[in-house]
UniProtKB/Swiss-Prot annotation:
Positions annotated to bind NADP(+): T465, S521, R522
Stretches assigned to the FAD-binding FR-type domain: 209-451
Protein species of origin: Debaryomyces hansenii (strain ATCC 36239 / CBS 767 / BCRC 21394 / JCM 1990 / NBRC 0083 / IGC 2968) (Yeast)
Protein name listed in UniProt: NADPH-dependent diflavin oxidoreductase 1
Keywords, comma-separated and alphabetical: Cytoplasm, FAD, Flavoprotein, FMN, Mitochondrion, NADP, Oxidoreductase
Gene name linked to the record: TAH18
Residue positions binding FMN: 16-21, 64-67, 102-111, 137
Localization of this protein: Cytoplasm; Mitochondrion
Residue ranges of every copy of the Flavodoxin-like domain listed in the record: 10-155
Cofactor requirement: FAD; FMN
Protein's job: NADPH-dependent reductase which is a central component of the cytosolic iron-sulfur (Fe-S) protein assembly (CIA) machinery. Transfers electrons from NADPH via its FAD and FMN prosthetic groups to the [2Fe-2S] cluster of DRE2, another key component of the CIA machinery. In turn, this reduced cluster provides electrons for assembly of cytosolic iron-sulfur cluster proteins. Positively controls H(2)O(2)-induced cell death.
Any one of the GO CC terms: cytosolic [4Fe-4S] assembly targeting complex
């Protein structure tokens, strides 16, 4: 492996569900480039695995942990490959490795993903470049505090290994674009016009993805008119669909025309070229769901379908944007310094207060600094993040011809008193009957399978739209005529306003197919406010189901307080009903997790 270049032999791989790990990877890559290195940076699943053997000398893996110790979706293929038993134990003995994990210590399997990856890579022969770091989102210093120390150690290790790395770097130097974009000078390349909807469908030409084409059958509000939350029951028709309860459906949203036009107008030099064809040089960034037809790619269509201009700007965004502020004026120099400040790890509080706390968008950031900003088209793929697909739990029993979703439309006011609308849910709300859409179906991490002989009870816990996979499971089991006891603990605000599918639950209850335990947190006459309280109210039933009847527990909903409180409540019930100590009860739940009897899907 002596032929591997020291400078280009650095590979940064990331596994990221929400974008945090990806941004740390991009930030680190830019830092290393300033030191003269030429790192590759890509998700774990999209790195050509043969390159680990041929092109990699120093391997850096940054990965978050999701759910119950799961790897992010874009790292599962990589893990499956490196776990192959036939791989020789000296396969990667030419590689020096370090890893950085992002996790939440309130979850039982804290940083489980990076531990598994790190351990397996060492088994395949990697040696350690510097010590693995496991960042904890729950600590006061947050992930940034861990990252700063780990990056310092990493840079020191690389400087000691690679000859000629400078001790410092000049952050004012603009590095060449990784994915340069230019406007085609060939007038014959001008694309024919397409409506945004029809243009989105050209993704279907990408044979590397499992895309499906469907049409909207219904898009109905199912919360009461006047209730603050608009929840949609979206029904999509398709062909040859294959899914089971627990699977998710990915949608590929687009930016609205008004936001796209606002961004273009903020950069006057973009206006005359907005609808001219683009040429992308070098490797095209990976776009999950496929790039729209490249022959129809213009600046406007690229922004509309692929550039995420509504998300909160991350550190790597500011690191690049600062270069495009005109520092020849006093205002411009001051603004450039402010943008650079937001890109520094040690100024994470400033970044949080400017971007995260008020949930300021990329578009708003550009508008705020636009007087002194001139963004070259060449750098747009280096500057803007790519729109990620949005995943929703499927809410219908398996059908080859249709699939249902329950979607809460995201609308809220920030501390700046500005109205925010979620990119995807705003798009979903606009969908009309018979609109054609592209989607894909993803298999569940839960590994939920119905037994073939004995059917243990299933205890389901879900507030709000978390009831989607429960509805899928309940309808599936009842349609098969299986005699299986189903218990649903469901929480919402009001019985009259947002008790989703209340009529369905009542009908199934009357047929003795479902035991339903609803609670309504905002109803005046409701003594039981939240699902964990309702569960404890039924502690004898729940204790008997878990300890005597081997019930499966299935929890779905928002991450954070709810799953933690439900787990604490179950520990209390096991202590009371099963006469256990707290450590014994906690171990019992852990055994249930490992045995597939305690399933949790949160976001």
């Amino acid at each position: 492996m002596s032929g591997i270049s020291e400078l280009s032999g650095v590979t940064i791989l990331y596994g990221s569900e929400t974008g945090n790990a990806q941004d740390y990877a991009l930030f680190l890559a830019k830092r290393l480039k300033y030191f003269g290195l030429k790192p590759s940076v890509v998700s774990l699943d999209h790195y050509p695995l043969k390159n680990l053997v041929t092109d990699t000398k120093y391997l850096i893996v940054i990965c978050s942990t999701t759910g119950q110790g799961e790897l992010p979706r874009n790292s599962k293929k990589f893990m499956k490959f490196i776990l192959k038993k036939k791989l020789p134990t000296d396969l990667l003995n030419h590689i020096e490795l370090t890893t950085f994990g992002i996790g939440d210590s309130s979850y039982p399997k804290f940083n489980y993903a990076i531990k598994k990856i790190h351990a397996r890579l060492l088994q395949l022969g990697c040696s350690e470049l510097c010590t693995r770091c496991e960042a904890d989102e729950q600590t006061p210093e947050g992930v940034d505090g861990y990252y700063s120390e780990w990056e310092t150690n990493l840079l020191e290790a690389l400087k000691s290994k690679i000859h000629g790395i400078p001790l410092t770097y000049d952050e004012t130097v603009l590095l060449p674009a990784d994915n340069p974009v230019e406007v085609s000078s060939n007038e014959s390349d001008v694309p024919t016009s397409n409506s945004p909807t029809e243009l989105s469908l050209t993704r279907m030409g990408d044979g590397s993805t499992n895309l499906l084409l469907g049409s909207v059958k219904a898009n109905k509000r199912i919360t009461k008119e006047g209730h603050f939350q608009d929840v949609r029951h979206l029904i999509i028709e398709g062909e040859n669909l294959s899914y089971i309860p627990g699977d998710t459906l990915a949608l590929y949203p687009s930016n609205d025309n008004e936001s796209v036009e606002t961004l273009i107008q903020s950069q006057p030099h973009w206006i005359p070229i907005a609808d001219k064809p683009l040429l992308i040089h070098g490797e095209i960034p990976f776009v999950e769901g496929g790039l729209i037809d490249k022959s129809k790619l213009t600046l406007r269509s690229l922004i509309t379908h692929h550039l995420d201009i509504i998300s909160i700007p991350r550190r790597s965004f500011f690191m690049t944007l600062a270069h495009f502020s005109d520092s020849t004026t006093e205002d411009g120099e001051r603004e450039q310094e402010k943008l650079r400040e937001f890109s520094k790890i040690e100024e994470s509080e400033e970044l949080y207060n400017y971007a995260n706390r008020p949930r300021r968008s990329i578009l708003e950031t550009i508008l705020e600094f636009q007087q002194n900003l001139t963004i070259p088209v060449e750098y747009i793929l280096d500057l803007f993040p790519i729109i990620k697909p949005r995943l929703f739990s499927i809410a219908s029993r398996p059908s080859p011809n249709s699939v249902e979703l329950i979607v809460a439309v995201v609308v809220y006011k920030t501390i700046l008193r500005r109205v925010r609308r979620g990119l995807c849910t705003k798009w979903i709300k606009s969908l009309q009957d018979n609109d054609r859409i592209v989607f894909s179906i993803h298999k569940s991490n839960l590994k939920f399978e119905l037994p073939t002989t004995k059917y243990p009870p299933i205890l389901m816990v879900s507030p709000g739209t978390g009831v989607a996979p429960m509805k899928s499971l309940i309808e599936h089991i009842t349609s098969l005529g299986i005699q299986q006891h189903l218990y649903l603990f469901y929480g919402c605000r009001n019985k009259e306003n947002d008790y989703l599918f209340g009529d369905l639950w009542a009908s199934l209850k009357s047929q003795n197919k479902l035991s339903i335990y609803p609670c309504f947190s905002r109803d005046q006459d409701s003594k039981i406010k939240y699902v964990q309280h309702k569960i404890y109210e039924q502690h004898e039933l729940v204790g008997d189901l878990i300890l005597n009847q081997n019930a499966i527990v299935f929890i779905c909903g928002s991450s954070g307080a709810m799953p933690r409180e439900v787990r604490i409540t179950l520990v209390e019930i096991l202590m009371k009903f099963g006469k256990m100590k707290d450590t014994e009860a906690d171990d019992y739940l852990m055994d249930m997790e490992n045995g597939g009897r305690y399933l949790q899907e949160t976001w």
